From Swiss-Prot:
Its main location: mitochondrion. InterPro entries: ATP_synth_F0_fsu_mt_fun. GO terms for biological process: proton motive force-driven ATP synthesis; proton motive force-driven mitochondrial ATP synthesis; proton transmembrane transport. This is ATP synthase subunit f, mitochondrial. Mitochondrial membrane ATP synthase (F(1)F(0) ATP synthase or Complex V) produces ATP from ADP in the presence of a proton gradient across the membrane which is generated by electron transport complexes of the respiratory chain. F-type ATPases consist of two structural domains, F(1) - containing the extramembraneous catalytic core and F(0) - containing the membrane proton channel, linked together by a central stalk and a peripheral stalk. During catalysis, ATP synthesis in the catalytic domain of F(1) is coupled via a rotary mechanism of the central stalk subunits to proton translocation. Keywords: ATP synthesis, CF(0), Hydrogen ion transport, Ion transport, Membrane, Mitochondrion, Mitochondrion inner membrane, Transit peptide, Transport. GO terms for cellular component: matrix side of mitochondrial inner membrane; mitochondrion; proton-transporting ATP synthase complex. It comes from the Eukaryota.
Amino acid sequence: MAPFPLKSFIPPQVANPTALNAFPSSARMGRIVDFYSRLPHGPAPKKSSNSFFSWYYKKYLGKNASGAPLLHLVGAVLVFSYASEYYYHIRHHEEH
């Protein structure tokens, strides 16, 4: 499927400089041309986020994907399970 050319959307007489001054609404058309000429050209810059999740994604899951997130998950489960076991063990001794 070939991309549709964008030039066919804009008729050549609309942006013609000689045609701009010929119509009585040329001031309005001049403002429109001025507005569109000030718009940025090219692709939009990539947004950078400074959150922990964006940093983690860039470091471990982006272009440099590795197995480190699996190790982090295993470590987090071990820490959580140890903390919960310790809490319930102390709670059991307080009740008896």
